[in-house]
Amino acid sequence: MGKIKLGEIDTRAPKEWDKQETKNRLVDILAELDELQNLLYAESKHSLLIVIQGMDAAGKDGLIRNVFGKLNPQGVLVTSFKAPTTVELAHDFLWRIHAHAPAKGYIQIFNRSQYEDVLITRVHKWIDDDTAYKRMKAINRWENLLEEHNSTHILKFYLHISPDEQRRRLDERIKNPAKQWKYNEDDYKEAKLWDDYMEMYEDCFQHCNEVPWAIVPADQNWYKEYIVATTVRDTLKGLQMQYPGLKKK
């Protein structure tokens, strides 16, 4: 594919989109999602891996809570990947990731993912480009492995916010008592590296697109949630699942 230029992609909903109408539609979509997730769990022939990437304050946590929070917790798993531990660093970079690959019947959500190992690591020059491109090839092979050998369907979302909106949200973490627990002064340091992160994300989109990325405008939470929920709903509907019948002895 041609190289994606994030600076040329809008971070907001099209002007003609109505906020309240979209929220009303989302209620219906979430009801469909609930039924489809139950069907996925009952049939247990497929699994779904949802990868969520984005800059700090892009709304990853809120998206997971508002779109997936009302689904049956028996069939939905969420893993947030932080900085690797000493044990994890002693293995290949995908070791800790593969441990959370979804079993058939499950939806697995990655809050950050294997892509951190070719993003922040490059921005801070912890790895060189040669290592990064080898890792990208490994990621492509790993995603193909899940698709081909476990009927895992993969959706990859990049939550696309503007630097101004990021700054507003980071500032709110200082001012709002309900959000102060999220505050981390390092987030401001990382925000200063915005252009470097955009460059690395764009390179990642180009070289890790065998499973395509969805670039989701994320300045407005209502629109972001609608786009992600709709994409997940459509993916599950496309599996043409059926409830199993009575088991014969």
Located regions from the model:
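Charged, amphipathic alpha-helical linker segments immediately N-terminal to NTP-binding catalytic cores
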Residues: 1-30
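Pre-Walker A adenine-sensing motif
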Residues: 32-41
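A glycine- and Lys/Arg-enriched "phosphate-lid" helix/loop adjacent to the NTP-binding pocket
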Residues: 120-138, 147-198, 246-248
